Every structure is written in structure tokens, then in C-alpha cells.
Amino acid sequence: MLAAWNVGAILYLVLTIEMCARSTVDKIRRRGRVQSESNVMTIVLVVSAVIAAQTAIVMELAMVKDLHGTIKAAHIALTVLTIVTAWAFMHSMFALHYAHDFYDSLAHHRPLGLQFVGTPDPEYGDFFYCAFIIGTSGQTADVTFINKPMRRLGMVHSVLAFAFNTILLAMMINIAASLF
């Protein structure tokens, strides 16, 4: 199950990186108009995927305790890879959501949800910066949430990141304990 998750997550991340690298601000604007309609669905997908990955990780860790040698090392490596891919998947999904919502709001003349200092036309990298800063520190550094719906989304992202990071810490302690 973890191998399938990792193949899917890595494929998603590679395709996302490729898409972002090739995108201009105009392409992001077009995608924003098409993809921002699924706000709730994005959150449901992210939460479901991360819960499924974490459940699989817990099940894997329970099994690892009875293994030895290279098989144990391989299972631990797979578990660590799953933790990394689940973490990156979650924040990448939020980054894309932030980008598409930003440009959808711009297209429909609604107040923008985010403000990037000195960057009137943010690119995907700016939104990934925002999402991964929330993912690592629970704050937004120099990106400002400027409307209520986006602040709520940022809060959900921050709470999910906190929960994920707390569970991640517990899992890493468990992995370290299973090594001895």
C-alpha cells in the first residue's frame, strides 16, 4: 500500500513541478479560472489523502517491530519516503489552491486573498513559498492573508500542518525507537 502511495505521490509531485516550471502568469490565470471552483473538494482530497497515508504509515510501523536486518531497513526507508511524500503532497496541493484562488479572484474582480510584498503578479514559486512556509513554521513570513475566506483556508492549512508535523514527530521517534 505504501509503495502505491509513493508512486502516485511522486508522479503527482513530478508532474506538478513540470507544470509549474513551464507556466507563465497567463497560464496560471487561465488555470485559476477553471480550477478554483473546487475549494471544498481540494481540502477534502488533501485531508483524505494525508489521513490515508498516515494510517498506512502507522500500520507499517507496527509491522516493522517484528522485522530484522535489511527487510526492516527497507520498510523503514519506505515509511520515511511515505512521510516525505505525504508532507510534500499536502503543501503542494495547498500551493496550487492558493494560486488558482488568487487568479480566479483577480479574474472575477473579487478582493485578492493573498498579498505578496513587491510581487503584483506572483508565479507558482511564490505560492509554493507561502504554502511550505506554513508547512514548516505555521506562519506566512512576508505573505499577507487579506480576506476572510483566505484567512480561513490559511488557518485550516496551518492546523493541518501542525497536526501532520506533530504526528510526524511521533512517528520519527517511533522509527528511532524501533531501530534499537
Task: Mark where each language-model region is.
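Loop-to-helix transition at the N-terminal end of transmembrane alpha-helices
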Residues: 1-14, 18
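Membrane-helix interface/capping segments
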Residues: 17-35, 58-68
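Juxtamembrane helix-capping/reentrant segments at transmembrane boundaries
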Residues: 28-48
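Alpha-helical transmembrane segments and their membrane-interface junctions
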Residues: 49-70, 132-148
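Interfacial segments of alpha-helical transmembrane regions
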Residues: 70-88
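Transmembrane alpha-helix/helix-exit interface in multi-pass inner-membrane proteins
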Residues: 84-106
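Membrane-proximal soluble regions of multi-pass membrane proteins
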Residues: 100-147
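Pore domain of cation channels
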Residues: 126, 130-133, 143-180
